[in-house]
Amino acid sequence: MGKLIEVIGPSGVGKTTLVNALSRKTQFATAYEGHIERPFQALFKQDRRYGLANQMDYLILRAEQEKELRASASTGLMDGGLDLDYHGFARLFYAHGWLSKSEFDLCRRFYELTRSLLQVPDLIVHLTASEEIIRARLALRQRINIASAEDTVLFNQFLDEWLVTLPAEQLLRLDVSAEDTEFGQSVPRILAQL
């Protein structure tokens, strides 16, 4: 079974850019969020009724990706992941009222069952950046943003509540506020953890 690294953090922090930078340095099997390919993402942006379908689609996708990456001979590297989609996005959706209590409970049950069947990632790289940096990065994006810069504090709170439950050796926290697109400071630190 291959190793798995999850890169997590709020929208706009640089998860995809870091995964790309790491992939240029070492051969990883990678998995991305695939916003454009997700059938409910654009629908949800237009109509909040699609909140549950969007969340379940992502949770299922991420579980499928984890299973595939674990089967690879290479170390797996995920842009986001199952844990981020539940602890960050599903909780954010519930807080905003985009998921009802029973819908959120369905997401929780699916996540807990799935996580009990799939090994926890070997390393979770938690990216943080200042709100100003995240706001600027989100403004430059050319894709659908469900979470906004205003959601960053709440999103980070949800992640922190989960992250404190993890063993310290499984977690690498990086403030990437000053990083460029090559992540010259962070890439060596992550590679040293492998």
Language-model features, listed with the residues they occupy:
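P-loop (Walker A) phosphate-binding loop of NTP-binding proteins
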Residues: P10
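Conserved substrate/cofactor phosphate-moiety recognition/catalytic segment
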Residues: R24-K67
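Hydrophobic anchor at the beta1->P-loop junction of P-loop NTPases
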Residues: V7
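Post-Walker A alpha-helix
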Residues: L18-V19
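Pre-Walker A (Motif I) flank of P-loop NTPase domains
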Residues: M1-L4
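A glycine- and Lys/Arg-enriched "phosphate-lid" helix/loop adjacent to the NTP-binding pocket
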Residues: H87-F158
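Conserved lysine of the Walker
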Residues: K15
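NTP-dependent small-molecule kinase module
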Residues: R135-L194
